[in-house]
Amino acid sequence: AAGDSTPKIMWTVVASLAPIVALATYFFGPSALLVVAAATAGALVTERALDRRGTLRDGSAAITGILLGLTLPAGLPLWMAFIGGVFGIGIGKLVFGGLGQNVFNPALLGRAFLQASFPVALTTFPAPATGPWWRLRGDNFAWPFASPRALDTVTGATPLGRMKFDHQGTPLLDLVLGTTSGSLGETSGLVILLCGSYLA
């Protein structure tokens, strides 16, 4: 609403993202929550370390971390998600002077940095709802720059990947419900629309 403070607006956005994170966790298990938490931790730590104006509590860094995490695959090593949050806040936001001064979206800049640096990891998408819920969906706890180990996980093509390479469409119901491979935030289109309407 008009006249709302910046922190109120930011934390309202965080609240609107919570159902999407919860649904990603339902589909991809604890890996989803770990990846979002690591990206958010990287963003918050960087905001706290580099910005001395007490902006950590306004919620903008938390939004950056959560949005970044939702653009990542569930099986991503947590250290990659963390440095994505560091890059997004440090280079995408604070270098330009902080909130409202940035030229690029910090979350997407962090995603672009990770995509350029670790293209294979960023395009390996575990299939949703495969195996026991509590099983990690990838190599979340891999050491930085260690050789990837063989993973007992099922991967799948994203809807766009299926269309491009297999010339197959994705059933509309799968897109609505979120039972497709992809990034954590590519879950249920219906839930995403409902969360967006909450902000309208």
Q: Residue locations for each model-derived region?
A:
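N-terminal signal-anchor module of multipass membrane proteins
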Residues: 1-47
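Short, amphipathic, aromatic/basic-enriched membrane-interface segments that mark the entry/exit
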Residues: 1-10, 48-57, 74-76, 177-185
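Hydrophobic alpha-helical transmembrane segments
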Residues: 10, 14, 20-28, 33-37, 47-52, 59-63, 68-74, 93-94, ...
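Central hydrophobic cores of alpha-helical transmembrane segments in multi-pass inner-membrane proteins
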Residues: 19, 38-49, 64-65, 85-93
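Membrane-interface helix-loop-helix junctions at boundaries between adjacent transmembrane segments
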Residues: 60-138
